[in-house]
Amino acid sequence: MAKLVTIFGGSGFIGRYIARRMAKQGWRVRVAVRRPNEVLFVKTYGVVGQVEPILCNIRDDASVEEALNGADAAVNCVGI
């Protein structure tokens, strides 16, 4: 099974590049964002089901923990 990465801020300028690149390398990509319905375009970065946006509030520990659940790696592209 492909490894899973969670990318925080994966819909931003740098995050988009990283999400695309990791999908091309065969990773399953979870893009953690504030408004997943506004970034559905990230699904086009891979095959069906490979890249998924999820809701995450980085100021809430439980939300971050849920976003990281099962991930093999994490990338932070969020500026606070």
What are the language-model segments listed below?
Residues 8, 32, 77-78:
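SDR active-site strand-loop-helix element
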Residues 27-37:
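Conserved glycine-rich Rossmann-like NAD(P)H-binding loop of the short-chain dehydrogenase/reductase
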Residues 36-80:
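NAD(P)H-binding glycine-rich loop region in Rossmannoid oxidoreductase-like domains
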